[in-house]
Amino acid sequence: MMKTLKKYSPKILLFLMLGIIAASCTERIDVELDDTYTRLVVDGQLTGDSTETHTIILTESTSYFYNQPPPPVTNANVSVKGDDGSSILLSEQDPGVYLLPEGFKSKIGVNYSLDIDLEKEIDGHIKYTASSSTPSIGDTVYIGLQYQPDWGEKGYYVVQCYYWDPLGPNWYMFDIYKNDTLLTDTISEKQVVDDTFYDGGFTNGIGVGYLDQSRKDQVLKPGDVISFRASSITEGYANFVWEVQDEVSFSTPLFSGPPANVVGNLSDGAIGYFTSYSVLFASMVFE
């Protein structure tokens, strides 16, 4: 009896261990996240493009697992004032969406302040403020394309920028368009760079956008018009975009911290950012 037991006991122990491991791997663990207090969320950009619709969007923050559009903040008094003496009271176009007049564009060198007066207080506050300067930008920018056949499944086209950078620290954000359709329509897709490597010099075709030829919306055909908008932004807004991109990018759960709200420039604990920037455009026809 003892001999038989000794012969098979390792296999029995192995099956028992595998069973325990399998059971532990399939165990359901429910994670409970406490809801925090509600805060005001602000999204507002003023640009030097008079053809753009300029809005200030106000919403309320929601819990981590909230799977619906955030509640809009309605019936607020929202105004934008410039230190050049300009003052604009915005109209509410849609719930939570406050519109600047058609044809508005921000002016280089002007500092703009945003004033928000809520109908009902949020997080104990009814008034919120923010401000932003409007950085200058050069006079001319040019666009180029370079094909990289070894990148990805079907290659990439690199959108290149040729530009004389003004002397001194500058920060730029780039949006890419194909036939007037914005391809970089989320903050995670925008290219934001500083001028560390070309301060006061020529950019000589730096990559500011990447078109994946295995993606239907990015495939280039003869006659397509490729454009970019170069925006001269503040250092604060550049850091904000970089931090948002870090938060939404892939990370290893075991070694990364929990998601957190990115610090903006609004007063009294509000989330988001209000900014103003100048812009240049460049376009080319793909052949």
Positions of predicted regions on the chain:
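C-terminal motif of bacterial Sec signal peptides marking the signal peptidase cleavage site
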Residues: 21-24
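A sequence/structural signal for flexible, mid-protein segments enriched
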Residues: 26-287
